[in-house]
Amino acid sequence: APYNDLEAVEKLFDTWGSGIAAVIVEPVGANMGVVPPKKDFLEGLRRLCTENGSLLIFDEVITGFRLARGGAQEYFGIQADLTTYGKIIGGGMPVGAYGGRRDIMEVVSPVGQVYQAGTLSGNPVAMAAGLTQLRYLNAHPEVYTHLEALGERLYGGMEKLCQELKLPYQINHVGSLGCMFFTEQPVVDYTSAKSSDTKAFAAYFRYMLDHGIYLASSQFEAMFLSDAHTDEQVDETLSIMRNYFERTVQNA
């Protein structure tokens, strides 16, 4: 089913009911740019899964420990049954993890009968780095206040820029995650994201790179703000963006 299309998911449940083992979803679509969930979308998925005895599985590799200490589940107030994690939990080291309800996790060894192992599982260097990272976030909740403020400053500034210059582009953002889609169409799913002008994005990316701002090189990747970023750096980024788009408008 398409992201943000609760009706399509409902039709699948009408057809298959409890035969659906799980619904797997990014709570914020972050691998097609950034696509926030529509109002009641995640809540609707939670309701359908509960009613049919299906698992709700959140892919929080990107949103986990970024939107909030409790990830998107804390941010939106929706609890998943299982969750996958990566990126931030490694403190800069490669790591992946999953977790969830006790009754599900107890099916996995050594408590349960489902065996899971890997040559690099529990790598001590990655575990030490990740544990240090999570302890820091636990002790410094102000990190999230700072990230939210940076997000509002950058993405709000981009929205203002588009309004002032009458640019027909879409600024999608949730917390410190954001994306400028080079399309007139509101972006709510993969299909609408694909309506973006990738050639226009490529020209924008090249200009920003030439002026010292290294963005993700694909229209369909998210922008990530870090606690290390400053208001001054955000303002510099917005200034360079303005210079580019003012030139673009003049040359149109």
Residue map of PLM features:
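Conserved N-terminal phosphate-binding loop of PLP-dependent enzymes in the Aspartate aminotransferase
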Residues: A1-A252
